[in-house]
């Protein structure tokens, strides 16, 4: 099976990964060590809805890997993969959010936020900490505390910033049936 990307998709991955890195450098600390409020997941969610699950996955994996490399504390693959999986899961449900058609009303906002909250709970509350325990032999209590705080913080930041980004994007799209002949 050969996967081909359009120029638009390649550019979306590049810009998305770059934004992931730059926005990810803004760290708002939490009381849990090595855990901060991250704002880049709103952009990743936007790109996942617009371009789909593979682009969302690549933005998360590439962006998080570069961010970790630049931060100087090494690559933490369980969390890098979790970032990619967040984009993948959100992108898998893109057909239920009508933003590409210029529609992002209360129903779409609700669906988007249910999807992203479940994705955040899954990847940060379960998969990333479980990976840390299995692969890195980290203390379960510590990494699950980090994961739960990260999941809540990311869920709230995507609910606010991601919703605003999708509202703005939907406003740039032409709604079906909105053009009338004079």
Swiss-Prot record:
GO terms for cellular component: plasma membrane. Its main location: membrane. Pfam families: ECF-ribofla_trS (PF07155). It is found in: Cell membrane. It comes from the Bacteria. Keywords: Cell membrane, Membrane, Transmembrane, Transmembrane helix. NCBIfam families: PRK13661.1. HAMAP family: UPF0397. PANTHER family: UPF0397 PROTEIN BC_2624-RELATED, UPF0397 PROTEIN SPR0429. This is UPF0397 protein SPH_0594.
